[in-house]
Amino acid sequence: MYKLIALDMDGTLLNSDKVISEENKQAITKAREAGVTVVLASGRPLEGMQDKLDELNINSDKDFVLYYNGSMVKNIGTNEIIHQQIIDGKAAKKIARKAKELGAYVHAFSQEHGLITEENNPYTDIEAKINGLDVTEMNFESLSDDHA
């Protein structure tokens, strides 16, 4: 008997229209009724997962969510952070510098500012749209070294 099922959202649980099929909803309901813990997992921020958590009624103190590609794990019912692995401002600045050298776009999720980028770009726009987030344009060099 399984005790826990972790489901990736994009490309797995969600179809190409970003919808949970009725078949998947029924299977999740059946698993939960059998006492299996169902965990949604995603590279998305929590805000970008909330509507699916609500749709599946994943909201009790026995429910967990894994987001930001696993860097955050949270008990949904109690809001307790179970795991947190984030980069600081010093690392973010180093990554942004390297991205500039390579001519790559960069954006990050800041606990203080939300979705941040130095220059708005199509990739950041897509990230913002998918997750329902506002974008803050800012110079990464202005982040304090201990900024999360």
Locate predicted features.
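Substrate-recognition/cap helix-loop segment adjacent to the acidic, metal-dependent catalytic center
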Residues: 45-65
